[in-house]
């Protein structure tokens, strides 16, 4: 059997990136809570261009 985690940067950014978080109300809630907590990295997108 293969390992269950098959990493792909495209899938990662499409599912957990900033633009995909902004699309839904729940995603915006995630961003708001991470901002309130003071996270330096809001989404996985911040690893690449910030």
Curated annotation (Swiss-Prot):
Molecular functions per Gene Ontology: structural constituent of ribosome
Pfam families: Ribosomal_L34 (PF00468)
InterPro entries associated with the record: Ribosomal_bL34
The keyword Transit peptide is assigned to this record: no
Disulphide bridges: none
Gene Ontology BP, a term: translation
GO CC terms of this entry: ribonucleoprotein complex; ribosome
Region ranges (Disordered): 1-23
Tagged with keyword Chloroplast: no
Record keywords, A-Z: Ribonucleoprotein, Ribosomal protein
Basic residues bias (residue ranges): 9-22
Family stated for the protein in its record: Belongs to the bacterial ribosomal protein bL34 family.
HAMAP family associated with the record: Ribosomal_bL34
Name the UniProt record assigns to this protein: Large ribosomal subunit protein bL34
Species the sequence originates in: Azobacteroides pseudotrichonymphae genomovar. CFP2
């Amino acid at each position: 059997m293969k390992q269950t985690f098959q990493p792909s940067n495209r899938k990662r950014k499409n599912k957990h990136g900033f633009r995909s978080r902004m699309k839904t109300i729940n995603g915006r809630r995630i961003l708001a809570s991470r901002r309130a907590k003071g996270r330096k990295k809001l989404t996985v997108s911040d690893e690449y261009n910030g």
